[in-house]
Amino acid sequence: MLTRNDLKGPWAGLPVAWDENLGFDEKAYRTDLERACKTGVPGVYTAGTTGEFYAMELDEWKQIARVTVEVCRNHGTPVMIGITSTYTLGAQRRAAYAAELGADAVQVALPFWMEMDDREINGFFEDVVGSCPGLALTIYETMRARKALTLEQHRAVFEVTGCYYAVKSNSNTIGCTPEGCRQLSEFVNVWVGEELWSSLGPCGAIGCASALVYANPRVILHMSDLLQQQSWEELKPWTDMLGRLNEEGLKPFTEKGYTDSAYDHLQGLATGFLSMNPRSRGTYLSATDADVRQLRAWMAANIPEFLEL
């Protein structure tokens, strides 16, 4: 089993490669996944938001999970599989399959169709980890799941599961606040976006479920080294650069209505690291080849170092 110490730094959450008919493009996905593994990332995961778990059937999820574990195993890269579902049994079935494949960890958000009652929280996580003994658990905490856990709820999950080692903290959750990050970091690793590493790193943030390490692994792995070394002054210009990318570079695409998967295809393709098709599945909007050219031009004019792979 992975330990808490293994769940640090930027774990690469690659987009899914779809072909022109929106079927899984296994060849393109393998190519990009192998390239990510060869960079020395601390781990890889799939079936989060960028991995479009919400836009595929169970048999497709199984195929993508199988390929991900196979490629990562071949390269000696730790691998985590997202198992989020709208119901407990769905998460359990995915957890059991991840264990069967030989994954190292699972990542799960709360079931999100109806907000969970506080009394259901511990039982849900106990059921999930009971289906994948020996695997580490990370929580994907997002307000898209309609509920944010309290510090006490995080601690209770830690105690009842015995394998909860990291939380992916997003906006409006406790891990994205300085005090909440400090308190959570006492017993689990807190992952936040790389642009927050210089501000929340001193509060204990130690890693990321990364959509940028496969845009420029050289830059993001260097930033991760600075994070582990607690070199806050050296880290700050890099996080400022990523803040500018988010606020300025991606602004035209935010105005178009793009969301996670479109952004993350777009950034990885704009730098030239990814080779897959920019398309993602509906309902949500896809990036286009023209968008890729537009973002690359902005990067060249404003953050040229991010194009240096």
Language-model-derived ranges and their functions:
Residues V67, D127, A156, E179, ...:
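Alpha-helical scaffold segments in soluble metabolic enzymes
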Residues L2, D6, A211-A215, K256:
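A generic short alpha-helical patch detector that favors 3-5-residue windows
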Residues Y29, W61, A65, A91, ...:
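A general structural signal for well-ordered alpha-helical segments in protein cores
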Residues S131-P133, T142-K251:
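Catalytic alpha/beta core domains of metabolic enzymes, predominantly
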Residues L2-A148:
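Active-site beta->alpha loop and helix N-cap motifs at the rims of alpha/beta catalytic domains
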Residues I64, F124, V157, L235-W238, ...:
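A structural signal for short hydrophobic/aromatic patches embedded in well-ordered alpha helices
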Residues D6, W11-P15, T39, V219-L309:
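C-terminal alpha-helical cap/extension of soluble enzyme domains
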